[in-house]
Amino acid sequence: MKLMVSSVTKMSNRHQVREKAVKTIFQLIRPQVPVSLDQACAFALEAGNDPEAGFEGSDAYLDRLVQGVNQTAEELDQRISHYLAEDWTLDRLARIDLAILRVAFYELLYVSEDEVPSKVAVNEAVELAKTFSDDKSKQFINGVLAGLLKDLKN
């Protein structure tokens, strides 16, 4: 199902796509006001964009990430939980960190290594943490993803 968003920017690279995906997923995690997937995506796509730049339509990989993460969120959360320290739960994670982890786990588990090498998925997640979170979160996200990578290689 392609997202129906009337005003969406054309993504110029995968990093921008991942930023928009994380912003979309973030809005769907424990929202104070219920929001639909289309509303969250529209807001994420329009946030921070110059209206003069023009709008040309959604990126196929953005649609794939957002739809995929949304459809597999429960499984992704179970897998993420497996890599958290014993005294940590998903509810203790910052919403932005959970959004970054969901996108990264989705890429590592559901996107082929040929399309997105695991090293790229991890590096992108760490870069997103640098942008949207703090140094502790960056290290935490890197550690969680390192655990998943270790298991995927075995």
Please state what every model-predicted region is.
Residues 1-131, 136-138, 142-154:
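N-terminal interaction/assembly modules
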